[in-house]
Amino acid sequence: MPSARTVFRFFAGLLLAGHVVSAAAAELPAVFTRALKQAAIPLDHVAVVVQPLDADAPLISHHADAALNPASVMKLVTSFVALNQLGPNYVWKTDVWADGPIRDGVLEGDLVIKGHGDPGLTLERMWLLQRELRGRGIRHIHGNLVLDLSDFELPASDPGAFDGEPLALYNAAPGALVANFNATTLRLKPAGHAIEIEPEVALPGITIRSDIALTDDSACNGWKDALVPDIPDPGRKELVVAGHYPRGCGDQTLSLNLFEPAVTFDILFRGLWAETGGTLDGQTVPGMAPDTPPLVRFESPPLTNALTLLNKYSNNLMTRNLFLTLGAEAYGAPATLDKGARAVRADLTQRGISTRKLVLENGSGLSRIERISAGALNQLLRAAYRSPLFAEFEAALPIAATDGTLKRRFRGSPVAGKAHLKTGTLRDVSALAGYVDAADGRRVSVVMLVNHP
């Protein structure tokens, strides 16, 4: 039986071949309805809108007003509003203060860091931040590391609540200070009859124990699924990795969402600082930044960089931080989920995009309750096309069979290289929205949402 993904591929092929564009207005092509029937997907669980960008009315509009879960296609909404409200050159800032005198490379006092939600503070960029601190004369810190997280006000959350996978990176929580997408990366290496585990960056205060059984299998299939990482006692900060690992896999890396963002930031900051010869004597404590100009203001790459990463690679954490940033910029800090939702609704309403069926939780689509209609998504795609920022919006989308999440999808199909599409997948949800260059030369906006087991 064909899957929803197979149906999507088939539908995109129909678009490019012109079968959809030549269909009678508002009708689903018969070949497409047959494909849905073969996949056992009822028509009332599907919403489709197709409209040439130069046309005033859709060619196809099926259940366009139905409120359906869009999965990661919701990222288009957050991205569209971000370009409108923040602008393509918006940058996040991370501010650092030295709360004491600096003499002969020693800070006699606390180092205070205030995060404003930069979602792309990778290890490489954290190293650059630390290099700026060294440029200000700091190599040794005789004080605490003080983290100011006050720009974000978030409810307590369970990273495993969504699907029972708390260590999966896609479940990483947002935060005012986030390092390396909240990923702790481990290197796995067969050594004799065991597996050695080494962290990518030194992890001060973290114990790693390998209980992995090395097998003699030469094939390397599903090795990640065969591993069972666990933190038996979060208070001890001990990571135990059990399971089995085929010798044929050789060296591999495993990235995990082990701790809440502030803890991961602390661990990685200390690890990088120590690796480059620095020392930090004190504890890590929460606190408030002083009301004075920072010693270092470290800026992120522009918003367009973040939009490319979060759309092409469907990065949930980046999108959730962006959603919160929208709220803070519109209504003032601290950022909250409610402010983010209000900011998104206000922008869409201002641009004539329907919000009647819109339900927002975190703006990323990693949600069981988020909803939007295919008609509203089509309105958004058309509004983006008319915007002076369309080039930035479209460039952030995966290209069929070319890059991002679509690099291995639509290969060998007529749509390969001729569509910019955002897809989304959850349990019982498949979704697709974007732009296709049809066979007759017209550009077409297309939305397809399927909510069915």
Indicate residue ranges for each PLM-predicted region.
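Sec-dependent signal peptide recognition
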Residues: R5-G13
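N-terminal signal peptide c-region/cleavage motif recognized by signal peptidases
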Residues: A17-V21
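Beta-lactamase-like hydrolase cores
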Residues: A23-D54, I60-A67, E132-R136
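Conserved serine DD-peptidase/penicillin-binding transpeptidase domain
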Residues: L28-L36, Q85-T355
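Short beta-strand scaffold segments in enzyme catalytic cores
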Residues: V48-V50, T94-V96, A433
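Residue-level preference for non-acidic, small/hydrophobic
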Residues: D56, K75-A82, L145, L177, ...
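Small-residue-rich helix-loop
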Residues: L59-S61, F323-P453
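Short active-site loop at a secondary-structure junction
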Residues: S61-V81
